[in-house]
Amino acid sequence: MKCTLRWTITALVLLGICHLARPAYHKKCGRYSYCWIPYDIERDRRDNGGKKCCFCRNAWSPWQCKEDERYEWLRCGHKFYYMCCYTDDDNGNGDGNGNGFNYLKSLYGGYGNGNGEFWEEYIDERYDK
């Protein structure tokens, strides 16, 4: 019994470490799929129909938002997130040349492909190595 309990505790500890060590995770909230980055709150938001891509950062008030950003709050479960978001739509033509992806391109270089994979690749490059 002690041996089984010891292995169970060891497995739970390892599972917890693996859970906390993940670089980013996806969370479904309403009709959007969010990818949270644990160190600085930036996210990629894709609407399945409208190809909307947002770049967001943590904020406490609308006054912290730049001219081309919108202040918004998002509820996930019992938590509320307050953010400044750049919310121009990508035109969804496959080459990522809508305003949303131009904004990401200007920040990080490279080209999007119109469906959010550019931002996913950026996350992979930055956090998975």
Curated annotation (Swiss-Prot):
Protein name: N16.2 matrix protein
Region ranges (5 X 2 AA tandem repeats of N-G): 91-100
Subcellular location field: Secreted, Extracellular space, Extracellular matrix
Sequence repeat residue intervals: 91-92, 93-94, 95-96, 97-98, 99-100
Species assigned in the record: Pinctada fucata (Akoya pearl oyster)
Family, per entry: Belongs to the N16 matrix protein family.
Tissue: Component of conchiolin, the organic matrix of nacre. Expressed at extremely high levels in the dorsal region of the mantle, which region may be responsible for the nacreous layer formation, but only in trace amounts at the mantle edge, which region may be responsible for the prismatic layer formation.
Signal peptide bounds: 1-23
Role noted for this protein: May be specifically involved in the formation of the nacreous layer.
Alphabetical keyword list: Disulfide bond, Extracellular matrix, Repeat, Secreted, Signal
Cellular component aspect of the GO annotation: extracellular region
Subunit record text: Heterooligomer; disulfide-linked. Pif97, Pif80, N16 and other proteins form a complex.
